[in-house]
Amino acid sequence: RDRLGTGQWFRDYYLLPLSGAIWSTPTQNILDFPAAAMMQFFENHALLNYSGQHQWYTVNGGSIQYVTRLERELKISGVEIRIKAPVTSVQRDAGKVTITCQGGLPEIYDEVVFATHSDDSLRLLPDASKEESKLLSAIRYQSNDVVLHADTSVMPRLKQCWSSWVYTEDKHKTSDKIDLTYWMNSLQPIPKEDPLFVTLNCTRNIREDLI
């Protein structure tokens, strides 16, 4: 900011809110992000333009389309998919790996690939090495309160200001969490006469009857 001469307004009312919305991260923590990686992300997603609308695409029919296609192809390839079988532990022994699922018996495999968050991976490893514990515990996560609702009061008073993502910050901010609303009718093919919003960490009251 100082080197480019963009000023505090650019930092506080564009860079930090937009970045906080993208990563659901408190704005004050955005300044800890590596600047080069952040700017590369902005460039890759065409977010460095200061005029016009950003072009975004969604999958027709929603993400269920590629999930079902991937599932079909995996099954054709002979992959067994198990649902409702959460893994509770992954134990290594004598070059093999023993997996235990909730309500099931231990099963032995040659190798295991973790496709989970780092903290979940660490929790599943009772015999994690010192290096594994250090690496897997180094990543921090931000918990967020999420509400699906139909209360339009969380959106700007002027409807022409409604956007797919709406960032809100109270003048006398008391929380370190970001207040963000996704306008689902804009993001997905949901009829506009059935307004739906997803709000993270709302600092205002959402009507109970609209949740």
What is the predicted function of each stretch?
Residues 1-89:
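Active-site/ligand-binding neighborhood in enzyme catalytic cores
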